A protein has these predicted regions:
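Short, surface-exposed loop or secondary-structure junction motifs
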Residues: 1-145
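Glycine-centered tight beta-turn/hairpin loop motif at sheet-sheet or coil-to-beta transitions
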Residues: 125-127, 148-150, 162
Length: 170
């Protein structure tokens, strides 16, 4: 390990491979089935799915996808309509699917330093799969971004004065 657990941080897609293996081992299901049963169905997301092969990208509009192989990412890609991306984030962070202690952990971000180019945060941080930080105006933004050939997607949730709003932009 590069760090003693809890003392350091570095983003790594390999980390998501370990999460994939953990989900499959604990649930006894393939990742696709576990996501459908434990996330997509409970959150009411009928069109979101996992893409692991080029054939899985049929009908997905994401820039220059014709030459894109989602297999380069260990865990695959979540694909679906933008409105369901915003709903996923809103319902996941604002609902009761996850226990309160886990939501707190998801929001316990490790500070990453100063602003990151192309990101909305003045004071960015990273937690359990969640990018989070303070944006201009003092709003707390939580979410994530992703990119592929010819495309970028951002899904954010803003919580201010007890009210939340989520959006997704492609």
């Amino acid at each position: 390990l590069r760090y003693t657990p809890g003392t350091g941080w570095r983003y790594s897609n390999v980390g998501y491979l370990y999460v994939l293996r953990l989900i499959e081992r604990v649930s006894g299901l393939a990742l696709e089935q576990a996501l459908e049963q434990r996330l997509f169905a409970p959150l009411g997301l009928p069109c979101v799915r996992l893409a692991r092969t080029c054939a899985d990208l049929q009908g997905v509009h994401m820039g220059e996808a014709s030459a894109y192989d989602p297999g380069w990412v260990y865990h695959g890609l979540l694909v679906g309509p933008l409105d369901e991306a915003a709903l996923c984030l809103e319902r996941l962070l604002g609902g009761d699917l996850l226990p309160a202690w886990l939501l707190r952990e998801m929001h316990s971000a490790r500070a990453l330093g100063g602003p990151i180019a192309g990101r909305p945060w003045i004071a960015p941080g990273y937690a359990l799969g969640l990018m989070q930080g303070t944006a201009q105006g003092g709003q707390l933004l939580s979410g994530h971004t992703g990119c592929g050939p010819g495309s970028v997607v951002a899904v954010y949730r803003c919580l201010q004065n007890g009210k939340a709003a989520s959006c997704a932009v492609f």
